[in-house]
Amino acid sequence: MIEGLLGRKIGMTQVFDATGQVIPVTIIEVGPCVVTQIRTKERDGYEAVQIGYQEVKAKSLTRPEQGHLRGAGKLLRHLREFRADNIADHKVGDVLTVEMFTPGQRVDVIGTSKGRGFQGVVKRHGFGGGPRTHGQSDRLRAPGSIGAGTDPGHVLKNTRMAGRMGNQRVTVQNLTVVDVVPERNLLLVRGSIPGAKNGLVMVRRAIKGS
């Protein structure tokens, strides 16, 4: 069995358990994914199953990409590789669905965080800023010292500064599957996941167990 699938973030909502407690959940459209290539140790040096997600028209892909996907029988926008318990269980063209997940199972969700652009240290790192009163004029959100008192003077290593924030790969681990809706390819997981709506995500079995 392959360890994960591709999907897209739909959004957040809430459901109620048997006792009436509110559970915040994220809805993910998972699959259907198509096996596009089998990586073998003899040919590639490692074992993995490559899958594709989200059908597109031919004009959206280059000719080499179209040739690569010819064996799968479908033109797909996103390709990713996952490990599998036994790659012999899969062959090119197989369709994988959300039914591989079950309620109560723990999963890891990998996505790309929202890009925030160039941000200061207060927003990017949670700095407290300078004093608000007693003559302070322009140090409200400044980073403060970045190495004063060093000899020779230099900026200390790993000093947190302003810079580009977000748009990075983020993994959220051990989220609980609340419900699976196979007829609509939907997976409901407890809590939030990284990224914007419609963003590509990878959902895999939790690597740290339940």
From Swiss-Prot:
Q: Which GO terms describe its cellular component?
A: cytosolic large ribosomal subunit
An example GO biological process term is: translation
Q: Which Gene Ontology terms cover its molecular function?
A: rRNA binding; structural constituent of ribosome
Q: Which UniProt keywords apply?
A: Ribonucleoprotein, Ribosomal protein, RNA-binding, rRNA-binding
Q: Where is this region: Disordered?
A: 125-151
Q: Name one Pfam family in it.
A: Ribosomal_L3
Q: Quaternary arrangement and interactors, per the entry?
A: Part of the 50S ribosomal subunit. Forms a cluster with proteins L14 and L19.
Give the family from UniProt.
Belongs to the universal ribosomal protein uL3 family.
Q: Describe its function.
A: One of the primary rRNA binding proteins, it binds directly near the 3'-end of the 23S rRNA, where it nucleates assembly of the 50S subunit.
Q: Report what the protein is called.
A: Large ribosomal subunit protein uL3
Q: Which organism is it from?
A: Roseiflexus sp. (strain RS-1)
